[in-house]
Curated annotation (Swiss-Prot):
Annotated function: Endoplasmic reticulum and mitochondria-associated protein that probably functions as a regulator of cellular redox state and thereby regulates protein post-translational modification, protein folding and mitochondrial activity. Indirectly regulates neuronal proliferation, migration, and organization in the developing brain.
Phosphoserine: modified positions: 211, 243
Keyword Disulfide bond among UniProt keywords: yes
Organism name: Bos taurus
GO molecular function, one term: identical protein binding
Pfam families: Thioredoxin
Membrane topology, from the record: Single-pass type I membrane protein
Region (Disordered): 272-296
Compositional bias ranges of the Low complexity kind: 277-287
Protein name: Thioredoxin-related transmembrane protein 2
Domain notes: The thioredoxin domain lacks the 2 redox-active cysteines, suggesting that it lacks thioredoxin activity. The di-lysine motif confers endoplasmic reticulum localization for type I membrane proteins.
Keyword list, A-Z: Disulfide bond, Endoplasmic reticulum, Membrane, Mitochondrion, Phosphoprotein, Signal, Transmembrane, Transmembrane helix
Extracellular topological intervals: 49-102
Residue ranges occupied by any Thioredoxin domain in the UniProt entry: 132-269
């Protein structure tokens, strides 16, 4: 199953992959990932390469290169078991393929290895992964508007994502969060986002660390009555995020989105008859110690 699941997901997403390859970032990344395969297999380039094969064929893999490629396949399958979206699957394949390519090129010729590393550095500096541009019902906050919007109508429940464009986890979660906003956004339940990579004072104010070591990005916070009710991922005593998978099912379950949505619809139907002090959702204001220990 560990092998079949990624293959089925890959085949199912062939149309989307074809659109990706039309973009410079994915096309160049795929080209770099397959660089050693192309150099080793395509004549006349491969004919001048050194080889350790007994038959002396320079256009075929030797046993050590096969071992490295098999090890790469095992690592990719292990990493993809925790991947949720196709973007995460493809990202893992690209990343570990480039590492394997660098090892193979350095083993072949140190000059080719240095050239490949240089190309990868230039690629990272000049090409950025495309941001999600699909449909969504999400309001984007700045450092000046987030507090004002949360306090404007305390009957409205807000789910706010704290993200940074450089974070691959945030990029992978973007289509999931957008899909949730399309399904659950209504008058009494709104979705928002704030770029803490750009507005650093917001990250300090809401205690969301932007350091890659803490793994706190993305962070989802539920606000009711203008105050924080819960957040995912939770933070341990060392300031590191407790491991939590940002899947659509987990967000719906942990944040009680179905219940929040039903209560928000009742709020929109009742209008001004409902006083502001009435709670919008029955989500506990604090996470019990037992749950925190269980999550950890």
């Amino acid at each position: 199953m560990a092998v079949l699941a990624p293959l089925i997901a890959l085949v199912y997403s062939v149309p989307r992959l074809s659109r990706w390859l039309a973009r410079p970032y994915y096309f160049l990344s795929a080209l770099l990932s397959a660089a050693f395969l192309l150099v080793r297999k395509l004549p006349p380039v491969c004919e001048s390469l050194p080889t350790q094969r007994e038959d002396g064929n320079p256009c075929d893999f030797d046993w050590r290169e096969v071992e490295i490629l098999m090890f790469l396949s095992a690592i990719v399958m292990m990493k993809n078991r925790r991947s949720i979206t196709v973007e995460q699957h493809v990202g893992n394949i690209f990343m570990f393929s480039k590492v394997a390519n660098a090892i193979l090129f350095f083993r072949l010729d140190i000059r080719m290895g240095l050239l490949y590393i240089t190309l990868c550095i230039v690629f990272l500096m000049t090409c950025k992964p495309p941001l999600y541009m699909g449909p969504e019902y999400i309001k984007y906050f700045s450092d000046k508007t987030i507090d004002e919007e949360l306090e404007r109508d305390k009957r409205v429940t807000w789910i706010v994502e704290f993200f940074a464009n450089w974070s691959s986890d945030c990029q992978s979660f973007a289509p999931i969060y957008a899909d949730l906003s399309l399904k659950y956004n209504c008058t009494g339940l709104n979705f928002g986002k704030v770029d803490v990579g750009r507005y650093t004072d917001v990250s300090t104010r809401y205690k969301v660390s932007t350091s890659p070591l803490t793994k706190q990005l993305p962070t989802l916070i539920l606000f009711q009555g203008g105050k924080e009710v819960m957040r995912r991922p939770q933070i341990d005593k060392k300031g590191r995020a407790v491991s939590w998978t940002f899947s659509e099912e987990n967000v719906i379950r942990e944040f009680n989105l179905n219940e929040l949505y039903q209560r928000a619809k009742k709020l929109s139907k009742a209008g001004d008859k409902i006083p502001e002090e009435q709670p919008v959702a029955a989500v506990p204001a604090a996470v019990p110690d037992e749950e925190s220990k269980k999550d950890k």
